[in-house]
C-alpha cells in the first residue's frame, strides 16, 4: 500500500495521474487516463504485456529494470506486446548507469529480441541522449540540438538549430531520474528530455520513413550496464492530414481449419490494404476478440468486428457496448462481418441498428449455406466500385433485421436464395414462418448505413469460408467497404489486390484437437 501511494504521489507531482498497478493481465483492466489522455502501459509489478529475455529484464519496487552483469555480445530488447504505435506521445522516467540504451518506436520486430527502426537514444555519456537514431538502418538521423528534414535518397536539410548539444546536455541529470517524452505526428518526430526539445526530425525519405510499428526498450551490447524505467505513459494522437486508422478485431478460433478464420482473414485484409492504400489508411490487427492495448481505440477512425457472435460476441461482454457506442457517437465507422453481425436482440440489437443499420436477429434471420444466384450490386455506391456480380458458396445469412424505416440503409449486395433454404425446420437460426412465406424473395446480404453523427456502418453476412477471399470480386467488395467505413474515398476501380495461394493459407489457425469420444471415457 505504501508503494502504491508513493507512486501515485510521484505521478501527481507530474500532473499525470494514473493507477493501473494491479497484478492482472492488461485485457482485464480498464484503462485509467488522466485529463491529458495518457494511459499507463506498465503495471508496476510484472512484465505482463512485455516480451524480452528474462535473464536481463525484471521489475522491482515499481521499476522496470534492464541489466547486464557481464559483457553482452548482442543488443537485446524488451518489446511491448499489446499493440503498435503510430501517431502518439510517450512519456516516461528513466535512469541509466553505464552504457547506452534507447526507446524504439514505429519499429520492426526481427525476432530473437532484435529490433530495427526509430530510436530515441539515451546514454550515461555526454553525446547521444535525445538524438534520433535508426537501429539497423540509417544510423544517426538527427543529432541533439538539430532540426533536420530527411529528403529522398537520404539528403539531409539542416534547419535552425534548437541549441548547442552541450547546453542541452546540461539539462540532463547524469545517473539520476530524467523524464523522456516522444511526440510522433505523421513524419514529424520530436524528442524531449526534462521538458527540453533535444531533436526534431521531419522524415520524408520514401521507403525509409515508418508510420507505425512496435515499441521497445534497448539493452546495448558491450560493457555491463543498467537502465531503469517507470511511469510509462502512452497517449494516442489522431492521425494528421487525410490519413485514417482502421482496427481489425479478429475473434478466437472456433471452427475447423478453413472456416471462421477471423485472424487469417484480418491479416489478409491488412496486407491488401497496406499494398493498395497504405499511405492513407493505417491498419492494426488485434486477435482473441478484443485488444489488450488499453489505448487501441483512442485514435481509431473505424473498427471491423470479425468474430463469433450471439451470446459470445466480444462486443457485448463487460462494458464494451457502452465503449463502442461512445466511439460511434464520435463518428467512428463500424463494420461487421459474417457471424459478427449477430447479437442478442435484447443486448446489442438496438446498438447495432444505430451503428450499422441492421443485425442478425434469432427467430427472424436464418443462416443457410448456399451459392449466390441472381446477384445484384448497388448502383453508384463507392463500396461497389470495380466490383462485378459474383457467385460464391458460403453461409449467407439473410432476412436481417433492419432499421425502420430503412430508407437510409443501402442494399449493397442482394441475391435470391434457393427455395430449399426456406424449407428447413423452424429454429433460432434455421427457419421461421416469415422466411418460409417469402420464397423467391430477393434478400439483402450486405448493406451500408450513413449515421446522423457522420459515422458509417457496414454489414455483410458472408465470410464463413476463408478460401472465398480468393474470389476477386468478393474480396474487393469487402476491401472497398473497409475503406469507405474508414472515411476514405474508394478509387473508381475499387481497391485492387492480389492474393497468392501461399498468402491465403499462411496464417490459418491450427486444426483443433480431435474431440474426445464421451462413450469411451
Identify the meaning behind each predicted range.
Residues 1-11, 18-22:
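Bacterial N-terminal signal peptides that target proteins for export
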Residues 24-241, 353, 358-361, 366, ...:
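Carbohydrate-interacting regions of secretory-pathway proteins
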Residues 65, 104, 119-122, 245-250, ...:
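Structural recognition of the beta-strand scaffold that forms the well-ordered cores
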Residues 71-72, 95-99, 110-111, 125-128, ...:
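Solvent-exposed loop/turn segments at secondary-structure junctions
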Residues 241-243, 250, 268, 421, ...:
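Extracellular ligand-binding/catalytic regions of CAZymes and related secreted enzymes
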Residues 248-249, 254-343:
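Helical hinge/lid and interdomain linker segments adjacent to catalytic or ligand-binding clefts
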Residues 310-389:
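A glycine-rich, often tryptophan-bearing local segment used as a flexible ligand/cofactor-contacting loop or short
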Residues 361-362, 366-453:
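Catalytic beta-strand/loop cores that center a nucleophilic Ser/Cys/Thr
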Amino acid at each position: 500500500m505504501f508503494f502504491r501511494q508513493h507512486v501515485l504521489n510521484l505521478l501527481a507531482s507530474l500532473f499525470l495521474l494514473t493507477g493501473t498497478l494491479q497484478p492482472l493481465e492488461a485485457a482485464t483492466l480498464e484503462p485509467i487516463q488522466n485529463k491529458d489522455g495518457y494511459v499507463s502501459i506498465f503495471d508496476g509489478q510484472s512484465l505482463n504485456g512485455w516480451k524480452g529475455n528474462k535473464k536481463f529484464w525484471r521489475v522491482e519496487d515499481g521499476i522496470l529494470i534492464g541489466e547486464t552483469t557481464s559483457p553482452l555480445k548482442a543488443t537485446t530488447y524488451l518489446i511491448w506486446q499489446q499493440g503498435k504505435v503510430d501517431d502518439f506521445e510517450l512519456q516516461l522516467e528513466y535512469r541509466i548507469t553505464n552504457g547506452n540504451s534507447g526507446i524504439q518506436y514505429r519499429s520492426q520486430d526481427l525476432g530473437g529480441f532484435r529490433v530495427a527502426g526509430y530510436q530515441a537514444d539515451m546514454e550515461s555519456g555526454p553525446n547521444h541522449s535525445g538524438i534520433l537514431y535508426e537501429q539497423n538502418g540509417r544510423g544517426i538521423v538527427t543529432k541533439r540540438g538539430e532540426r533536420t528534414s530527411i529528403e529522398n535518397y537520404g539528403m539531409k536539410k539542416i534547419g535552425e538549430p534548437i541549441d548547442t548539444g552541450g547546453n542541452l546536455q546540461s539539462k540532463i541529470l547524469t545517473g539520476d531520474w530524467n523524464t523522456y517524452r516522444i511526440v510522433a505526428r505523421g513524419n514529424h518526430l520530436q524528442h524531449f528530455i526534462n521538458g527540453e526539445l533535444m531533436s526534431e526530425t521531419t522524415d520524408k525519405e520514401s521507403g525509409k520513413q515508418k508510420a507505425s510499428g512496435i515499441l521497445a526498450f534497448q539493452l546495448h551490447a558491450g560493457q555491463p550496464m543498467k537502465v531503469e524505467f517507470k511511469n510509462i505513459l502512452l497517449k494516442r494522437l489522431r492521425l494528421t492530414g487525410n490519413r485514417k486508422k482502421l482496427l481489425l478485431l479478429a475473434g478466437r478460433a472456433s471452427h475447423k481449419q478453413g472456416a471462421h478464420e477471423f485472424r487469417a482473414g484480418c491479416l489478409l485484409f491488412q496486407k491488401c490494404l497496406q499494398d493498395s492504400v497504405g499511405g492513407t489508411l493505417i491498419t492494426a490487427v488485434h486477435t482473441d476478440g478484443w485488444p489488450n492495448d488499453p489505448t487501441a481505440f483512442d485514435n481509431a477512425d473505424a473498427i471491423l468486428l470479425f468474430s463469433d457472435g450471439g451470446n459470445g460476441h466480444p462486443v457485448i461482454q463487460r462494458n464494451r457496448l457502452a465503449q463502442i457506442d461512445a466511439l460511434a457517437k464520435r463518428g467512428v465507422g463500424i463494420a461487421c462481418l459474417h457471424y459478427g453481425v449477430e447479437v442478442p436482440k435484447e443486448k446489442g440489437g438496438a446498438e447495432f441498428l444505430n451503428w450499422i443499420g441492421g443485425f442478425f436477429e434469432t427467430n427472424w434471420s436464418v443462416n443457410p449455406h448456399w451459392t449466390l444466384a441472381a446477384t445484384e450490386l448497388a448502383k453508384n455506391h463507392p463500396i461497389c466500385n470495380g466490383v462485378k456480380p459474383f457467385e460464391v458458396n458460403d453461409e449467407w445469412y439473410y432476412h436481417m433485421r433492419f432499421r425502420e424505416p430503412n430508407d437510409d440503409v443501402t442494399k449493397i449486395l442482394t441475391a435470391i436464395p434457393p427455395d430449399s433454404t426456406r424449407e428447413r425446420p423452424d429454429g433460432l437460426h434455421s427457419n421461421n414462418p416469415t422466411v418460409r412465406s417469402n420464397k423467391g424473395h430477393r434478400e439483402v446480404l450486405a448493406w451500408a448505413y450513413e449515421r446522423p453523427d457522420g459515422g458509417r456502418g457496414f454489414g455483410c453476412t458472408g465470410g464463413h469460408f476463408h478460401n472465398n477471399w480468393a474470389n476477386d470480386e468478393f474480396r474487393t467488395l469487402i476491401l472497398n467497404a473497409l475503406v469507405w467505413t474508414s472515411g476514405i474515398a474508394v478509387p473508381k476501380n475499387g481497391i485492387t489486390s492480389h492474393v497468392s495461394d501461399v498468402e491465403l493459407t499462411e496464417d490459418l489457425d491450427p486444426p483443433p484437437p480431435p474431440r474426445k469420444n464421451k462413450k469411451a471415457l
